[in-house]
Amino acid sequence: MSEKIHPVTKPVKARALIDQAKYQKWYRQSVEDPDKFWGKHGQRIDWFKPYTKVKNTSFTGKVSIKWFEDGLTNVSYNCIDRHLKKHGDRVAFIWEGDNPYIDKKVTYNELYEHVCRLANVLKKHGVKKGDRVTIYMPMIPEAAYAMLACARIGAVHSVVFGGFSPEALGGRIVDCQSTFVITCDEGLRGGKPIPLKENTDTAIHIAAKQFVTVEKVLVVRRTGGKTGWAPGRDLWYHEETAKVKADCPPVKMKAEDPLFILYTSGSTGKPKGVLHTTGGYLVYAAMTHEYTFDYHPGDIYWCTADVGWVTGHSYIVYGPLANAATSLMFEGVPNYPDQGRFWDIIDKHKVNIFYTAPTAIRSLMGAGDHFVKRSSRSSLRLLGTVGEPINPEAWEWYYKVVGDSRSPIVDTWWQTETGGHMITPLPGATDLKPGSATLPFFGVQPELVDSEGKVLEGAADGNLVIADSWPGQMRTVYGDHERFIQTYFSTYKGKYFTGDGCRRDEDGYYWITGRVDDVLNVSGHRLGTAEVESALVSHKHVSEAAVVGYPHSIKGQGIYCYVTLMVGQEGSDALRQELVKHVRAEIGPIASPDKIQFTPGLPKTRSGKIMRRILRKIAEDDFGALGDTSTLADPAVVDDLIANRQNKADAA
């Protein structure tokens, strides 16, 4: 375990917004008097009607979370209109296409026009405040316009990652009963077309079978590829936006009106619609963006995430735009046309702040230093990581090779549910330890508890909970508040349970050790084991499946599947490939199984519960200490699992 410390350097300290003394003072104020602290910082956004109530939250009983509840504001207004007078000509988005020769810049004035036109199109077709609009888009500016246009008129957006399958998209349309979809003819990733419109058509068909009718589909022309067309339902984006005015007044929204739903994986099979609201979310996204990245006006900021994930919501669109920043949006992938693409983009657009995932770092590290060295990267001032813990070796490579040992790394821990950074270094305030997310952001009160719920003091290892609310926190699971209470507040009464394990060292630094529930973290993306299991079991030859994670050198966690076949069905490599294809079709490519082991049975207790602990150990090629297997209904199953494991160290 790395305990090497990289102290804050003089040049970083000299220009930092927050130094150590200020961090300690503000942090103390934020936890001792949250009403006063957030009452002040809530004013970083503009309000049509100022709030008088700041915090009204309870983690017990029915669980209710309200911030700034009597204030009126609008997210789109805060991200665009209020900047126009002083910064209308500032670039809001730099868009870098999949093709390295194609890019464009969109100023705040232009953004205003694009968003207002799209908002007027939505209104013209009957979209009203509170209606749910599904956005299934590639990384093109229109994806951000769509989010902001919804926010402008009070519609609730549900962005679905363009890598998800039609089945996954259909399920999300049904869950929030969305009747309007915004998509694209095709996406482009690594030179390959992605059939988004075709997927949308299939998803709408799936939704219709569950009695949810999509009435309109607005289609952006990206590639000009051939697509199916339903006259009366399907509309071309470029035709519709040309017919409406370029002005649309923002709707006055209550702070607790819904802003968006974003589906994330849970430990049960059905994805959860995480609901974020208007005021608290924007205050928190903007404040974390400014202080975590030490953002100064004029900085060029690039987060490599996709808008289909929360990182894209908070740190490509809402946080940066609320701060009048220039945000780079990249359509492509890190290894196209070659493994130097990220570094070429940094030079091309003079990027100052670069925020990416450990998976990308590990894979580019494996490609060799020469791809990095051929670029200058001299504009870089700050590096960030997000999505999963970063191993110290990758951290050091990122720091030394990519950042030339002069750019601090902010290793940010947070979740879809938290809306913004929770535990993170602040560049001018926090000495860095490779692999540690370091210290809590303002207002965040982490605690470690043991399995009985006892709070652990000092250096300790335990389950990470948050003791009190913060403005960016999700408010509920869409349409299922009971599930919200059960998932997050029932394990440790009166505390928000993160689902992560964590170690706190003697300096009070936090080290995230990974999920403690049945959720996988694959390449920084969350996937429920139950989702993958139900995809496998839906195949006609599969009788039962159990899925666990195992250490993977690039993705962090790989997906290891134990599959029991129907009687009389033989396992084969061809069937393995067929099952991989089947899971990709059901969920999407991110859920592709890495290893599939056919097994006559699974280790179950006499009550029928699968003992996942044993499956995890075998998947990790570590079966010397399987613990007590005497409670198993059929202990012989374990010997078969060990003998036929797919990841023997010598086979690697």
From Swiss-Prot:
Q: Where does ATP bind?
A: G387, E388, P389, D411, T412, W413, W414, Q415, T416, D500, R515, R526
Q: Which reactions are catalysed by this chain? A: acetate + ATP + CoA = acetyl-CoA + AMP + diphosphate
Where in this protein does the record say N6-acetyllysine is found? K609
Q: Please list the residues that bind CoA.
A: R189, G190, G191, K192, T311, N335, S523, R584
Which Enzyme Commission numbers does its entry carry? Answer: 6.2.1.1
Annotated transmembrane regions: none
Which keywords are on file for this protein?
Acetylation, ATP-binding, Ligase, Magnesium, Metal-binding, Nucleotide-binding
* Gene Ontology terms: cellular component: cytosol
What InterPro entries is this protein classified in?
A: Ac_CoA_lig, ACAS_N, AMP-bd_C, AMP-bd_C_sf, AMP-binding_CS, AMP-dep_synth/lig_dom, ANL_N_sf
Q: What is the disulfide pattern of this chain?
A: none
What GO biological process terms does the UniProt entry carry, in alphabetical order?
acetyl-CoA biosynthetic process from acetate
Q: Where does Mg(2+) bind?
A: V537, H539, V542
Q: How is it modified after translation?
A: Acetylated. Deacetylation by the SIR2-homolog deacetylase activates the enzyme.
Q: Which cofactor does it need?
A: Mg(2+)
Q: Which GO terms describe its molecular function?
A: acetate-CoA ligase activity; AMP binding; ATP binding; metal ion binding
Report any Pfam family annotated for this entry.
AMP-binding_C
Q: Which PROSITE patterns match?
A: AMP_BINDING
Instruction: Name the NCBIfam families for this protein.
Output: Ac_CoA_lig_AcsA (TIGR02188), PRK00174.1 (NF001208)
Q: Which family is this sequence assigned to? A: Belongs to the ATP-dependent AMP-binding enzyme family.
Free-text function comment from the UniProt entry: Catalyzes the conversion of acetate into acetyl-CoA (AcCoA), an essential intermediate at the junction of anabolic and catabolic pathways. AcsA undergoes a two-step reaction. In the first half reaction, AcsA combines acetate with ATP to form acetyl-adenylate (AcAMP) intermediate. In the second half reaction, it can then transfer the acetyl group from AcAMP to the sulfhydryl group of CoA, forming the product AcCoA.
Q: Name the chain's protein.
A: Acetyl-coenzyme A synthetase
